[in-house]
């Protein structure tokens, strides 16, 4: 129990406080609700009005026409005439009547400000309304030029900062749309007005005026042509803008920097026939260098940081000489070892290289010099963020150097590889990832594209080849044991290296392959998959022949032991071999596989079953390499003839190899016969392979065997026929037709031969196809369903040919085909429907308008097929319906009328038999979805009305189809048109019988959900009977629940994205000119946010700007003249506290002894450490003392309350055996309800009623433990009964008088 009268800990801080002596006051200090109530009774508001004196003055002067733009001149330009016309008459409208109906789209954003409570927004609205009214009163057309003239005149008249900011904001909007000739003509007067305001407002407290004036000035300068930049006055105005890039106020500085970037990158003459550099680039660069040198050595380096931020965007815009000067300046300021300055300088270099500028900006020599200089600024491997930035900058620098001059760039890469590989020793995983990614990108971007030019890479090579060898040696060093923690990253690098350079550099990589194989054999090697991937990359690029020369298989069939330490190479080669010599398989693997097969057979005869199985598996693995060797081989024309006989024998005599060899043949034909000579060579052996494959396919599958080999044989036949000579195909087709007609052929043989005919038909000539058609025509009406289906499959393959003999046959026999298909309609079996519909689909695609009757005759059959059992038949039926619709669209000139004619042919099905009605609705549903853009509104509405009538059917099939149609209609129809029929649909659904409503409850629920989303809950509820209301309420609850869940999920996703953005390194602004010229028109809407965010950023900046100096080792003094002294300036706090270490529960003293304290002492130490951590961040010692005292007082009060409520548990915990056995009791479910001072359980507020619960436990399935559980359950039941009886007796006693 807590102390009487004392509030719980933490509650007192939430209560309302009052000053001493005012505890009895009852009148509230805040009375905004009373003031709001008074304003309803026509009293004057007590607060400050938004109508200022300046606004009234501005309005009066605009109305009187006394304001003019500049001196009175003769009306030489259209702009001056418009200005005079605008300001002559008085307005007769109200004060703000020109705001809501302003016709110029430039100010569409301002019209949204009217409802804002911001005084700045209301001032903008007032100024725009006044200017618009004056322009209208003068008969103006409200063009951008008229607004520009009126606003410039207004700017000279207003005095208060609020009005001036409003005018400048509107000018900023309108200047972007004013024609360039106008701004060029009025540049002198306009720029003078802006410069005067900038001078007057430079030291004022308000930032709004300067922000918008600077933006206006940047837009004005951007519109000037190249000739105007030759005048000194233009550069003088630009320098005025440039001087504000070092302004102490961030919003002004940001506006100026944005303006400078937009001028240098986005001036109008920089797009077409642009000069090499902007005329103002030189003076800008000199200004940046001067400002950095002026303030570079100061302690805070604020101006330096501002200039570096500007250089980050502008460095790629400068000429080469100034880029060199800026780079030297950046390198000089980096020697100051100021952490933030170094980071910003790195960002500037990154933006320079990332922009990939031309030679006029960055030459290859200068790029190389910068790379060399940056090696003096390599951060410490323990300094995480600076090292990540340095690696990224160097990656971009080398990629850009290779782009400019590849041989020079390759010469610089070995040094970077050596440095980056050293980074793999860093304890930070982020550094490992960044270094690995940088090296991989360089290999892909810089090395791989030039390997063909480099040629063979050997250990004695020179030039670029020598550089590649050095780079590989640097990566290969990562396989030594000191890099064992980074072996995963090293293997990734080797994988990319093999892919990029393996073909040319394999002489220097052989030793590495041997090391990899030895490493894989080491016990408990954890990176087997990555190593296999690296060796696989070597196989792909070098070829298996080179890899096996470096690391032989060591398998020859004469082994004394069965270890086979390098047998793991066979699966690796299988998965990665391609584009290699097919002859190598013939000369190396084929003889070895035969030797191992013989060895396996000998061992099997000798009774050594296990050894025989091992050798048999090895030879089978060697055969599985064949498909890879057949993938784009380099010597098909030379090597295939030596392999063809072996493959034929393997197919016919080795069932275990049949699938593999067939796959190899298919791969060779599809991926290895691109050259005509290769194609001819493989085609030459078709007369040998096809008869073997035909005979195999004709053999029945033995009992217990899988049909996979048979399918593989048929697929191989199809593939081989694509390159077979037509005469051979015709002869094979003729023999197959004879076999089909042979009465002695069994059903299995006839079906198998028909499968072969299906494969042969598309490759035969027209005469052979005509003869085949005569052969299969009687089978289209066969009563044997399998034969009939195969006959239709033959016809389908012939009709599917888009060109060639098949297309010619269809064109010449079209009438005969139509007659045959219509005559065989009634005799078509269900299995034959799928190929028949497919055949009709291909024929309908080729029909013209005169064949309209044929399509009309097909419609009833196709509609009924939408309910076929076969999924394929249903799909083909729907596809054919859509194709018929497209045919009608081809036939007619008006698409809507043509589609209506097609639908009229389907409508009669709605009044036929039940099955026909259901199928017709399904067909109309599919057509509605497919042709929703072509159906007229009246057609869709008519369909919907008819389907609603069919909802009254007593057949579930019809109702199901009708509900499906309504669901599609709701999705497809426009809300405005659907709204007319909501009542009709709801009434039809409301009249459904109870049985229908119960059966289709899920469909109805989905339908109601769609209607509620479109028309609202109340309307749907009003239109439906009361028995549906409960469902509707549940739907509304489910929708609200889903909406809340989506909102929470979205918030979580956004939070994760924000965290990821915070974790990402800082990047420069967008590279595109569109981002630079994007409107920066957001006013002070987010000032409060920025202000609060600014405090956090300043706190973070103080932390980030801190630097730590790493001392020398031992008593050795730190040498500040050492060129690598910059590496000792760390942005990350050094020492053991930075790493994530294991907490053993005890503090350790400086000499390594454990410090064991009581818990209270530990809390005290934590408090002192927490206070100490805060001390380091406090600037004022007195402020620190106050904060610490307050903190200790608060902790003291909390501690006192906790000591009264909690009792410290003993430190000793039982364990071990004997008297030290575990004594903790198991937590029993429901134990928290047990009464402390009585028997039984008690109810607790906010918790469910007491319960007895036996948890499910898998161990209770044990027979012995099951009996124990039964006893436990019986005890619970008895206790419950006993408690019930006691309670019953007590209630009876209470009822007695």
UniProtKB/Swiss-Prot annotation:
Molecular functions per Gene Ontology: RNA binding
Family, per entry: Belongs to the RRP12 family.
Glycyl lysine isopeptide (Lys-Gly) (interchain with G-Cter in SUMO1), cross-linked positions: 71
The keyword Nucleus appears for this protein: yes
Protein name: RRP12-like protein
Modified residues (Phosphothreonine): 77, 88
Tissue expression remark: Weakly expressed. Expressed at intermediate level in testis and ovary.
Keyword Zinc annotated: no
Pfam families named among the record's database cross-references: RRP12_HEAT (PF08161)
InterPro entries: ARM-like, ARM-type_fold, RRP12, RRP12-like_dom
Compositionally biased residues, Basic and acidic residues: 1090-1099, 1154-1173, 1233-1243
Biased composition (Basic residues): 1188-1197, 1288-1297
Organism: Homo sapiens
Modified residues (Phosphoserine): 49, 66, 72, 97, 1049, 1072, 1080
Transmembrane segments: 903-923
Acidic residues bias locations: 1053-1065, 1073-1089, 1174-1183
Major subcellular site: nucleus
Topology of this chain in the membrane: Single-pass membrane protein
Protein localization: Nucleus, Nucleolus; Nucleus membrane
Gene that encodes the chain: RRP12
An annotated GO cellular component: intracellular membrane-bounded organelle
Annotated region described as Disordered, given as residue ranges: 1-29, 1047-1101, 1131-1297
Gene3D superfamilies attached to this UniProt entry: Leucine-rich Repeat Variant
Signal peptide: none
Keywords: Isopeptide bond, Membrane, Nucleus, Phosphoprotein, Transmembrane, Transmembrane helix, Ubl conjugation
